[in-house]
Design a protein with these regions (language model features):
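Flexible "arm" and connector segments at domain edges
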Residues: 1-107
């Protein structure tokens, strides 16, 4: 089976445990960022799809995947979860969150 995509670190090991031989390569920095961005889009689409009648646990699992990719992207710039949370809080203080469910029609 052909994949041609960034996978989690243990995936080749898991494939090998199934008596298959994974063919892999290590990405360079620029390609790694590109593939992380592609993976983020993929995982966000899966979060949306999980909202279509799937269980709350499935959506939570998909949100966890999004967070994992976000953390990998943040790590490239030497940021971590605390930094992401701080940036989100600063934005929330300036512009608010989404708690009030406000839908802007026009200005």
């Amino acid at each position: 089976m052909e994949y041609n995509k960034l996978v989690r670190d243990r995936i080749p090991e898991i494939i090998a445990e199934d008596n298959r031989e994974p063919k892999t390569r290590i990405l360079g920095e620029e390609e790694y960022v590109t593939e992380l961005e592609r993976k983020l889009r993929e995982e966000c689409e899966e979060v949306i799809a999980a909202g279509d009648g799937d269980s709350a646990e499935h959506r939570l699992e998909e949100l966890g995947d999004v967070l994992e990719v976000m953390l990998a992207l943040a790590k490239i710039d030497h940021f971590g979860l605390d930094d992401i949370a701080f940036a989100a809080e600063q934005k929330r203080k300036k512009r608010g969150g989404f708690d009030k469910r406000i839908y802007l029609i026009e200005d």
